[in-house]
A protein has these predicted regions:
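Alpha-helical coupling/stalk and coiled-coil linker elements that connect catalytic or binding modules
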Residues: 2-5, 18-22, 33, 57, ...
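Helix-turn-helix-type domain boundary/helix-start signal
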Residues: 4-7, 39
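Short, charged amphipathic alpha-helical surface segments
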Residues: 35-41, 53
């Protein structure tokens, strides 16, 4: 696939898309989440790019929604679908599903939709979906406690490119390596020449390090899981709640995630926790140990009776000796006990092991002094030892965890993709169930154009434009149970007549919604739908008021263009007569109907001038009617399903008929009716409607 041939994709965007692992696969699948990981591409832009790629794949010329009202209907039904999603991804993904005239595209989505309608779900699944989001790329990693070392300049450049997470140092000899070991917890020597050297510290000779970067920097693979920890856990929860087949071992992945914090550090290891706590508490524990020793020594001094003869006191003064000498001579045991108390407190407070305890004991000298003070150098040495031990432990645990999770990465990606796609499926399933939808039946043949006929289809199917049984418009702002189901079938071009507020516009909305959803490949709100595959949908809403000359000219020109190329089109028009005076409107509409009929288009024109239009047309125009059964308590009783080949009575005719019936019954006026308002007057009016 030539990326720049996708509508809306230029050189810069194409370059960004090539950064994806499999851009063509993502584009063909409409994988918005993957496309949105390309540099500089948002989810909204990804949806538009995916839609363009799908059009290219199916040789779809676009333009199915040929008018503003047709596009508005699409936006409205799309909004109904999107309102039933949980994730932002699913809402964007639904925008890649659009009405198309291409059979291959429709059938692709139909297969997806049929599977979706079979999905079972409950609130547990929907709740779990709330935590699922597309995976994010981890940020740049910088590991400061490790470094790479080499004596070769070329190797140095290779190392910087292969493992940018670590510093790379040039060393000339073993002494240089030893100096690095004093500044880093771990030094990885890249040169075979360093094999066998003995150096204090953690020095590893790994000539293969650049070929196995994950072993040297386990933070690299772990950063992916750390950054997406909550997203992955949510995807696991979705799979369990929905009883989905998983692309990876859920138990193993969950166990790995439980051992990893969101900052990329290893979690749940007691020894690592001990070392971390010891480092954090070292300064406080050393200070407390000092206080413990001094408190012990002060108490001992208070309780001890010290007797010094004059000659001894004179000798101490002459030697310049102070209290330290006095402690050494008179309170040696008490001082030793105080120091031992400090040492034990430091060791116990930090939970030090034997080797660490040996260093800690040296923090308090055996040489008597008051007050007792810790040796700062020894405390620093202990900190270095603890830090090095922690880094060694963390490094080993990270390598082990990275190895455990290494085989889970692609499966984890698929796990999230499947969870997000489930949200798309459930949105379709919820829409289908809430509006009692069914999958439509297309009656055209194998051609790619909806206007092409097939010799294999039945005679009844060959003629149908659309046939809707038990349809309920999803655009009505009413509960589904409050909407009367509508049956309507049209072949060719028909006029639709009916009383005011009888549901003519709602019928057009129903037809438009059904046709749009069907060409999207989605279920439609009806008991059964058969229709041909159309090339485009022209839906013209009712014009508010008479148009001025310029607007009138533009409207007529638009219909002239449509009439010239109407084959394969579905044309829905609501009261076109409102554009000008009734007489002229009837003539114009008759001419448009003639042209559309000659060109094989399918159309429904709502009009109150059906009788006049039929008289002016040069062919037998089909007139259907939404019939009112009568007036009850001032309200129309209407059969919402259009009656075929029937000119419906108008609202004025129904009112006059009602008045005539009432006039024939004097009791309705409490007595005899004057001649001027008698039944004869209303009967004469009724004759005018014949």
């Amino acid at each position: 696939m030539d990326l720049e041939s996708i509508p809306g994709v230029g050189e810069k965007t194409a370059r960004a898309l090539t950064a994806l692992d499999e851009p063509e696969r993502a584009l063909r699948r409409g994988d918005v989440a993957t496309i949105a990981t390309a540099p500089g591409i948002s989810q909204g832009r990804a949806a538009r790019i995916a839609r363009g790629a799908i059009r290219l794949e199916h040789d779809d010329p676009g333009g199915f929604l040929a008018t503003d009202r047709a596009r508005e209907v699409y936006r409205n039904v799309l909004a109904l679908l999107k309102s039933r999603t949980v994730t932002d991804y699913a809402a964007q993904r639904l925008e890649t599903i659009y009405p198309s005239p291409r059979r291959s595209r429709i059938e692709d989505v139909q297969a997806f939709a049929r599977d979706a309608l079979e999905r079972e779900y409950d609130e547990t699944v929907l709740t779990a979906l709330e935590g699922v989001e597309p995976l994010e790329k981890p940020g740049d990693i910088r590991v400061r406690e490790r470094c790479l070392a080499t004596a070769d300049a070329e190797r140095y450049s290779e190392a910087r490119d292969a493992i940018p997470e670590l510093s790379v140092e040039i060393v000339e000899d073993t002494q240089g390596l030893a100096e690095l070991a004093r500044g880093y917890s771990t030094v990885v020597a890249l040169d075979e020449s360093f094999a066998g050297v003995t150096i204090d510290g953690d020095v590893q000779v790994r000539p293969d390090a650049l070929e196995t970067p994950a072993e040297i920097v386990p933070e690299r693979p772990l950063s992916f899981f750390a950054r997406n920890r909550s997203r992955l856990q949510a995807a696991i929860d979705v799979h369990r709640a929905g009883d989905l087949e998983a692309a990876c071992d859920l138990e193993a992945l969950e166990d790995g995630l439980s051992r990893l914090d969101e900052d990329g550090t290893v979690a749940g290891d007691d020894e690592l926790d001990r070392l971390t706590t010891a480092i954090d508490d070292l300064e406080t524990a050393a200070g407390t140990a000092e206080s413990v020793a001094n408190d012990h020594l002060r108490e001992a001094i208070r309780e001890e009776d010290v007797t010094i003869e004059g000659s001894d006191l004179l000798s101490l003064v002459e030697r310049g000796a102070g209290v330290d000498s006095l402690l050494s001579r008179e309170l040696a045991d008490e001082y030793a006990a105080a120091v031992e108390t400090a040492r034990e407190h430091l060791i116990d407070a930090l939970d030090l092991d034997q080797g660490e305890a040996e260093i800690a004991r040296r923090a308090f000298s055996d040489e008597p002094t008051f007050p007792v003070e810790r040796d700062g150098d020894v405390v620093s040495r202990l900190r270095e030892e603890l830090t090095a031990a922690k880094e060694r432990r963390a490094g080993r645990l990270k390598r082990e965890l990275a190895a455990d999770l290494a085989d889970q990465r692609e499966g984890a990606r698929q796990l999230v993709r499947d969870a997000l796609e489930l949200d798309v499926e459930l949105a379709i399933a919820r829409f289908g169930r809430e509006f009692e939808c069914t999958m439509p039946e297309f009656v055209d043949g194998d051609s790619h154009s909806a206007s092409a006929a097939s010799s294999e289809r039945s005679a009844s199917d060959e003629q149908v434009g659309f046939a809707i049984d038990g349809g309920r418009s999803p655009l009505l702002d009413e509960p589904l149970e409050a909407i009367d189901p509508v049956d309507y079938e049209v072949t060719g071009v028909a006029l639709l007549s009916g009383v005011n507020s009888g549901g003519k516009t709602s019928t057009l909305d129903l037809v438009a919604s059904v046709v749009v959803l069907a060409h999207m490949g989605l279920p439609v709100p009806a008991e059964r739908v058969r229709l041909q595959r159309f090339d485009d949908l022209h839906y013209h809403a009712k014009t508010q008021g008479t148009l001025d000359a310029g607007a009138f000219e533009s409207t007529v020109r638009e219909f002239a263009d449509l009439a010239q190329g109407g084959e394969g089109s579905l044309v829905l028009v609501d009261e076109l007569e409102s554009i000008t005076e009734p007489g002229a409107s009837a003539k114009i509409i008759a001419g448009i109907l003639e042209a559309l009929s000659e060109n094989g288009a399918t159309g429904v024109f709502v009009s109150h001038l059906a009788d006049e239009i039929r008289e002016m047309a040069d062919y037998d125009v089909t007139v259907d009617g939404i019939e009112a059964m009568g007036l009850v308590d001032g309200q129309l009783e209407v059969n919402r399903s259009p009656v075929k080949d029937h000119l419906a009575r108008s609202t004025p005719e129904l009112i006059v008929e009602k008045l005539a019936d009432e006039a024939r019954e004097p009791a309705t006026n409490g007595g005899s009716v004057p001649d001027v308002t008698g039944p004869d007057f209303y009967d004469r009016l009724l004759e005018k409607f014949d």
